[in-house]
Amino acid sequence: MTEKQVIHRILQGEVVSNKSDKSITVTVVRYVKHPLYGKYIKRTLRCHAHDENNECNIGDVVRISQSRPISKTKTWRLVEIVERAKG
């Protein structure tokens, strides 16, 4: 049998909530160009991610990877903390 090569999406964003146990909410910001007017529009994506060791705080910049569904809303997993929140 041949094995499928799985490519996981990796996104970088800011932690906006860590109230749940072993879970964080990450906001990912991207800019898209309007097709007609050419103006860049800010689009945000809020993802729930699995934080196994509860090591993230609000304001941290993190990298998350897509994974199998962990719960009803969690389909992302924490890969690394890029930058800690100041203060």
UniProtKB/Swiss-Prot annotation:
Disulfide bonds: none annotated. PANTHER family: 40S RIBOSOMAL PROTEIN S11 FAMILY MEMBER, SMALL RIBOSOMAL SUBUNIT PROTEIN US17M. This is Small ribosomal subunit protein uS17. Part of the 30S ribosomal subunit. The keyword RNA-binding applies. Keywords: Ribonucleoprotein, Ribosomal protein, RNA-binding, rRNA-binding. InterPro entries: NA-bd_OB-fold (IPR012340), Ribosomal_uS17 (IPR000266), Ribosomal_uS17_bact/chlr (IPR019984), Ribosomal_uS17_CS (IPR019979). GO terms for cellular component: cytosolic small ribosomal subunit.
